[in-house]
């Protein structure tokens, strides 16, 4: 029951936050709402073409905060944090993978594919249902629904 209530709250929060992000040309990448040692935290991860600055985070935080104060979906005090997803950001949706074609990624699978549960390679192609990775000298097709976790590999 608690999971259902949590998921409903996340959906409400997304329904409030996402239109604000879109209005100001940001993409809502992810939302987290969790209890931490210092209290409840609502984390909003945003992105935009060219990357996100500290000023962007402050600007959109103010807009989101005003709307959350009006709609008041959270019944107790919390801290709002707005940030970019970082260099080693998780990839979750088709568009996340599309944005990073040609970049290295580390993927953990829900079940083995071709005898592997973890795969590292470059994103070669993305379609509606699959991500194709170039692993060494061969291509590996991975259904997006079979991906447990995907992280960009930062190369310097």
Swiss-Prot record:
SUPFAM superfamilies: YhbC-like, C-terminal domain (SSF74942), YhbC-like, N-terminal domain (SSF75420). Its main location: cytoplasm. Pfam families: DUF150_C, RimP_N. One of its GO terms (cellular component) is cytosol. It comes from the Bacteria. One of its GO terms (biological process) is translation. Keywords: Cytoplasm, Ribosome biogenesis. Required for maturation of 30S ribosomal subunits. Belongs to the RimP family. This is Ribosome maturation factor RimP. It comes from Dictyoglomus turgidum (strain DSM 6724 / Z-1310).
């Amino acid at each position: 029951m608690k999971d259902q209530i949590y998921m409903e709250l996340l959906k409400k929060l997304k329904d409030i936050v996402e239109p604000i992000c879109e209005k100001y040309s940001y993409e809502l990448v992810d939302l987290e709402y969790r209890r931490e040692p210092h209290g409840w935290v609502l984390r909003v991860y945003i992105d935009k073409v060219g990357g996100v600055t500290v000023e962007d985070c402050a600007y959109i935080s103010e807009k989101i905060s005003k709307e959350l104060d009006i709609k008041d979906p959270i019944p107790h005090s919390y801290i709002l944090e707005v940030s970019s997803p970082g260099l080693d950001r998780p990839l979750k949706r088709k568009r996340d993978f599309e944005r990073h074609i040609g970049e290295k990624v580390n993927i953990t699978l829900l079940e083995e594919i071709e005898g592997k549960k973890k795969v590292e390679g470059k994103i070669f192609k993305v379609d509606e249902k699959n991500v194709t990775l170039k692993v060494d000298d061969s291509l590996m097709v991975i259904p997006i629904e079979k991906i447990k976790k995907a992280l960009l590999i930062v190369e310097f």
